[in-house]
UniProtKB/Swiss-Prot annotation:
Its main location: cytoplasm. It comes from the Bacteria. GO terms for cellular component: cytosol. This is Flagellar protein FliT. One of its GO terms (biological process) is bacterial-type flagellum organization. Residues 1-50 are annotated as: Required for homodimerization. It is found in: Cytoplasm, Cytosol.
Length: 121
């Protein structure tokens, strides 16, 4: 049984999933990005399984190489966007912790407490 066309199709599907994940990260749709991750992982596992079953020819490897490059580029961009988001969340958690400390320290004194404001635009 020739699995080469199926392997090529699986790679095309992985490219589509990779592009979807990049779009979701670019649009800051974090919940949807996380939800799409399992389909991406399953597609990678399917490709690994198919690649074990057949030994792709040199020609096939040359055809797959641009797709692999695109997937790796997309993955790198998604990781960069996720790192930016993680940094934003860490900053928010830090601000929340400071606000909680201020409220805890001065909250029982009956006066007004001025907490730091969020200056994000």
């Amino acid at each position: 049984m020739n699995h080469a066309p199926h392997l090529y199709f699986a790679w095309q599907q992985l490219v589509e999933k990779s592009q979807l994940m990049l779009r979701l990260a670019t649009e800051e749709q974090w919940d949807e990005l996380i939800a799409s991750e399992m389909a991406y992982v399953n597609a990678v596992q399917e490709i690994a399984h198919l690649t074990e079953e057949i030994d792709p020819s040199t020609t096939m490897q040359e055809q797959l190489r641009p797709m692999l490059r695109l997937i790796l580029d997309n993955e790198s961009k998604v990781k960069q966007l996720l790192q930016i988001r993680m940094d934003e969340l860490a900053k928010l958690v830090g601000q929340s912790s400071v606000q909680k400390s201020v409220l805890s320290a001065y909250g029982d004194q009956g006066g007004f407490v001025l907490a730091p404001q969020d200056n994000f635009s």
